[in-house]
Amino acid sequence: MCGIVGYTGKRPAQGILIQGLTRLEYRGYDSAGIAVQEGDSLAVIHRKGKVASLEHTLSHFDFQGTCGIGHTRWATHGKPSEANAHPHTSCGGHIAVVHNGIIENFAELREELEGRGHVFTSETDTEVVAHLLEEAYQGDLVAALRDACSRIVGAYGLAAVCDMEPGVIAVTRKDSPIVIGQGEDGAYVASDMIAMIDATRDVVILGDGEYARMTASGIEYTDEAGHAIEPRITHVDWDLDLAEKGGYPDFMLKEIHEQPRVIRDTLAGRLVNGALSIDELDLTPEELNLIDRVYVIACGTSYHAGLIAKNLIEGWARIPTECEVASEFRYRNPIITPTTLVVAVSQSGETADTLAAIRDARVKGARVFGITNVVGSPVARESDGVIYTKANKEIAVASTKSFLGQVVSLTLLAMLLAQAKGKLRMNQIRLLFRELADTAEQVERILAECKPSIEEAARACKDARNALFIGRGMGAAISYEGALKLKEISYLHAEAYPAGEMKHGPIALIDEGFPVIAIATKSPVYDKVVSNLQESKARGAMIVAVATEGDEDIKQHADHVIYIPKVRDAFSAITASVPLQLFARAIAVERGCDVDQPRNLAKSVTVE
């Protein structure tokens, strides 16, 4: 991991590669580098740290070569260092390669290569590819790449250049995303469309085992056997503005403020003649009615959206539902039948563990639905149907608008299953849909009105070393997301627990000034949450309560209150999540943290 770019064309590659790497910074990384064909040799420069450091170094060179590759690295094999940064080169320096993924048999390959006299200069698994290419190269870089990949076990997205083939980039992939596009001035390759967004909107999403030979004049696609194949072109409707902050101090705040639009866009066209319509799922009402078990599988923030979905699907459709972390689901033996529905939730659509879980579920006979933000992503392609969250590109590492889009999409799915099962009548569907649509306006109110109370609470908590998030029902599910957001971007340790579990352990943590953040909105379990607040307050906790507007009683039990509009309990996760996002961001800003690119994190986890 983490980001690949490449260009071959009419213009100097250096600036194009740096621009592409800058746009991939949001994915998280610890070092960066480029390789450019300069004259009859390769110029390779890499630096530990930010792309800006690499750009500063390159300002002293001003390479004019028009073909090159670049990479931002998030360490998997080998510590973050200049030596471990990509691109990696062959012994003679004639071939350079960049790689996303993990090569599982690299230790065995390295031992063999060293035994044949190859000298390694890094700790990475990627460097074995450069040496394999060197051994296999006989004048055709794509053929050498095909030979090298026949010996590799693992996941990879690879791009390579050779000084003996001017203007050529060889590309392939297996279980790691690669997109290729032809612009007016040349050919582009990247691990993420946003790196080439100003050059083309029509891209080819390379398939597993497919190869591309890129030149300034065109791109040739072949399969593992070397036979020509027709590319599948996907049009992506993203604006260049997505890669800009648009006047906000950071992408996270911008994306938080985009959430009302995400709700509206995700719901657009979903109610037809009073009934829910999600044609992309490609299952008839009769087939949906046969579903008797649901698994929601996801990782990180998406897992928390799945917890909310579990409550809604069981509550409305009365179908037994489990929400499981994808990396755990795939390594046990879940009960799956042809009437089992597996719902895979992934912002990027390329999360490695989620993809592996999908494949396992399909082998066992399950129907698979995907919920993702990326058109044409692996999750979308490998599912029987897909709901797109319509959040557009999310740049900040900590998910906000994509999370809300997932919650809205999963809410629609719960309503659709209940409709198919006959558990919700048409008039109930229409009422729920209208109230769900109204949450967009309620989120706008939160964004407009809650800033003072959120910032006051953040200042009170910024110097804490730990925090506890609690809630019941929907509040418990959203507490997990609040705690994750806080620790992701502020590095303040936070845990989340169902409030009813307080006396079973977590209450031992509480002493004078210990922050307890509670979801205390009006709900069937409101009185029990208040009881938990009283227990915490009696032990010296500093209480921050997210509460329903008009609830004056909560002030007796909380030091800080953040009021949000009253909504149906089923939709409370949508409105309650927004102040928790803003709260986490405010604390991170107070602590001087980089909210868009928190340390050690990657936006998209494409390795296991």
Predicted regions and their residues:
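Hydrophobic alpha-helical scaffolding
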Residues: 7-10, 99, 119, 134-138, ...
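Generic C-terminus detector
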Residues: 226, 542, 555-557, 567-608
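Active-site phosphate/pyrophosphate-binding segments
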Residues: 259-263, 267-295, 385-515, 588-608
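Glycine-rich phosphate-binding loops that contact phosphosugars or nucleotide phosphates
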Residues: 289-431, 435-438, 519-564, 583
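Structural beta-sheet core signal
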Residues: 4, 97, 160, 171, ...
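Conserved short alpha-helical segments that host acidic/polar catalytic motifs at enzyme active sites
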Residues: 1-245, 249, 261-292, 331, ...
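Glycine-rich oxoanion-binding loops at beta->alpha junctions
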Residues: 70-83, 272-286, 309-345, 351, ...
